Amino acid sequence: MVRVRFAPSPTGALHIGGVRTALFNYLFAKKHGGDFLLRIEDTDQNRYVEGAEQYIINSLNWLGLTYDEGVGKEGKYAPYRQSERKPLYKQYADTLINNGWAYYAFDTAEALEKARQECEEKGDTFIYNWATRNTLENSLSLTFEEVQQRLTRGDAYVVRFKMPEKEILKMSDMIRGEVTIDTSTLDDKVLFKSDGMPTYHLANIVDDHLMEITHVIRGEEWLPSMPLHILLYRAFGWQAPAFAHLPLILKPVGNGKLSKRDGIKLGFPVFPMDWTENGETLKGFSGEGYFPEALINFLALLGWNPGNDEEIFSMDELIQLFDLEKVHKAGARFDPEKIKWFNHQYLQKKSDAELAVAFQKELIAKDIEVASTKVEKIVSLIKERATFVADFWELSKFFFEAPKKYDEKAVKKQWKENTPTIVREVIEVLQNTLDFNSVALEEAVKNYMETKQLGFGQVMPPLRLALVGELKGPHVFDIIELIGKEETLRRLETILSFIK
């Protein structure tokens, strides 16, 4: 059975790259009828940020990425916070020491800094590995008695992995194919820290094994760690999961990985939900009015393509189509305009009733009381030009309040010498129209235009100016029907008194 995990660290807001990693894990699990786990990797207590864990959970919930096991959904592999699994890791570190795959290292920070400086003076780069480990203070260079004495008196130590010397390691990645590396170029990574906590590397491998993870799908930034992780599985005598390293999400312009600073600089969110740090709230996609399904659709196509020209996919369709082998190796450029396009598409797909409920909240905040049926009709007329629900007010405020000014360029272009006469005659036509609906109103005005031999441009633009204040908006007669006879006539009289 397929089992995958999303394993973020609670060191701040969940970045959009992390969201995509969670999404691809979720899609892969559901495609294969498997389980999607959430594990919180909080081994680095110095970087722990209060509230970050709950933020991660809230973000996944908002996006509809429901996990089968994890924090708050305890399964048989609980607990799912690494800080709560602390006693577990020491025994596995000891196992590696006992079977010769790891060793105690007692080097102080000062001693390591001195070794680095000496290497740099020779023009070399210091690496703690097969070439240098026997010259440093560790259980490989010290006698057994010296090591026991140091451990007994409580000397600070870390546990390092004993990287094999001069081995050409061949690994398989589901996205990148075969990856080869010479272990001589790798360092002896710390697996267990002096504070009694494991590093990411040890905890990650132990937990993935114990939780029976079958596929590790993570960001490209973890590709350099793959050799160590493969070798750790070998050292423990365990079957390694399949690995897949996702391409980076790149800046909209320029080189490099998308960062929080890019969002701030260019004015778009990079977090799923609003996040407050140092007293400053950074807007997320949720807070900016994006629909979760629009963000999901957008992220799914960042680095993956189903092999056709379609772009709009429901979650069920994404699950059905998703294939890790179709994920690209190259980085995917983040396009803030494209996600707006997706949001526009999903806004059009929503019912007028659903959008009206959201819009009515804004109207209530403005102390505007309108029947829900009327709000629905207004939404149906304006949503085609909207990207966000927040756009509705600017697109529709003339339904709720008369224009306070008129577009000067439009007035100059459309308000002719005979326009006041035409407007007065239209007022009379509207006053005499008994059936005050869009169809009847349009027919009455068209009959008037034919009788007077007037063109569209002589009548409709001035009429729109009077009602809206500018030459934009929905069908004029739909506007007239919704604002009503009394308000329509008032606005026509107002523009006559305003423009002399």
Where in this protein do the model-derived segments appear?
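Glycine- and acidic
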Residues: 5-10, 38-42, 211-216, 277-282, ...
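Structural motif
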Residues: 285-293, 329-335, 369-378, 450-458, ...
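Active-site cores that bind ATP or allylic diphosphates and position pyrophosphate for catalysis
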Residues: 104, 108-262, 269, 281, ...
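Charged substrate- and nucleic-acid-binding regions of tRNA-handling and nucleotidyl-transfer enzymes
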Residues: 438-499
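Conserved phosphate-binding loops in nucleotide/dinucleotide-binding enzymes
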Residues: 79-83, 106, 192-193, 211-222, ...
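Small-residue-rich helix-loop
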Residues: 352-452
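Residue-level signal for inorganic ion chemistry
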Residues: 25, 56, 96, 100, ...
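N-terminal Rossmann-like or analogous alpha/beta NTP/dinucleotide-binding catalytic cores
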Residues: 1-124, 224-235, 294
